[in-house]
């Protein structure tokens, strides 16, 4: 990998979440400077590119349209292949980036993909053959973190703040209701509601309950979410017999989840693959590696290829 440039969108923090209109405008403003910087860091010219890979979905349509339009224009101007990439496939395949692991991951592997928009358990048989074993039926785990953080008065995105405060808290301080789905699917809406009601009850007796016990509240809530994730991934591993287990997506940066997986790996014959932090949140490298494997297959999408807010896995 020659370069992996990212333009942050801190503009959303003031609104407590991503604002689609602001996101697409930021994409328009940043896309040219980011590409120029990427080429400069890589020390190559546009004419040396072999193909253009881009995200065509799923995601916010306005932002996707900016990237799709630019990618099509660039591929046409340079007369090189145009390769559309599924956003979630890219998260899963980020583990194939050359510098992702000291020992390369091998197929098959299970991938727990956890972010603000998705929670999925995926059986990865090859770069182009993947099967969803389970996914959330309502809210993603990243959203569960962010909504709880908002209730606690923490900045957006809330997940990293809960993670940081959890390190200083007691994970047994509070208990929250968790769903008990019989399969590999997830549900976090009930836990979010349980979290809200538990705090409301405590604050009736002690209005300063959150301030007095913030670290313990965060630690308890994070532990409850991780318990659900670990229960499902362990069940899927046992059922499939797959020995390689990976995580992906923004929540894969969570220190508690990473520690729980590493502890499981140390106590079993399971090989755990944790992505480097630069490959956890959305990044260009993961789109590049997913596009690379399609390039090897000779993929060259027509210029009529469109962005899609929702797209089949």
Predicted regions and their residues:
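N-terminal beta-alpha supersecondary unit
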Residues: 1-58, 87, 91
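A contiguous, well-structured pocket-lining segment that forms one wall/lid of small-molecule binding clefts
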Residues: 4, 163-245, 254-268, 295-298
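Short glycine-rich phosphate-binding loop at a beta-alpha junction
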Residues: 46-56, 240-252, 273-275
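Glycine-rich phosphate-binding/hydrolytic loop that grips phosphoryl groups
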Residues: 91-94, 275-313
């Amino acid at each position: 990998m020659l370069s992996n440039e990212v333009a942050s969108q801190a503009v959303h923090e003031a609104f407590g979440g991503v604002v689609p209109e602001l996101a697409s405008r930021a994409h328009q403003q940043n896309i040219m400077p980011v590409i120029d910087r990427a080429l400069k860091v890589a020390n190559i010219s546009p004419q040396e590119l072999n193909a253009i890979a881009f995200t065509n979905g799923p995601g916010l349509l306005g932002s996707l349209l900016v990237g799709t339009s630019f990618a099509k224009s660039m591929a046409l101007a340079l007369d090189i292949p145009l390769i559309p990439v599924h956003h979630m496939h890219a998260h899963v395949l980020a583990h194939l980036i050359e510098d992702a692991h000291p020992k390369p991951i091998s197929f098959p592997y299970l991938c727990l993909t956890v972010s603000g928009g998705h929670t999925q358990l995926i059986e990865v048989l090859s770069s182009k053959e993947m099967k969803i074993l389970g996914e959330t039926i309502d809210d993603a785990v990243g959203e569960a973190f962010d909504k709880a953080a908002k209730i606690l008065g923490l900045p957006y995105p809330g997940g990293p703040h809960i993670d940081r405060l959890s390190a200083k808290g007691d994970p047994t301080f509070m208990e929250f209701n968790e769903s008990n789905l019989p399969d590999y699917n997830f549900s976090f809406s009930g836990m979010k509601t349980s979290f809200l009601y538990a705090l409301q009850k405590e604050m009736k007796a002690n209005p300063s309950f959150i301030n007095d016990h913030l670290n313990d509240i965060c630690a308890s809530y994070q532990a409850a979410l991780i318990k659900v994730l670990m229960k499902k991934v362990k069940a899927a591993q046992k059922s499939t017999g797959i020995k390689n287990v990976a995580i992906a997506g923004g929540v894969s940066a969570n220190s508690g989840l990473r520690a729980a997986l590493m502890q499981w790996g140390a106590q079993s014959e399971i090989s755990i693959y944790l992505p480097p932090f630069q490959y956890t949140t959305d990044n260009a490298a993961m789109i590049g590696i997913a596009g690379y494997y399609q390039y090897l297959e000779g993929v060259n999408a027509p210029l009529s290829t469109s962005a899609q807010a929702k797209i089949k896995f």
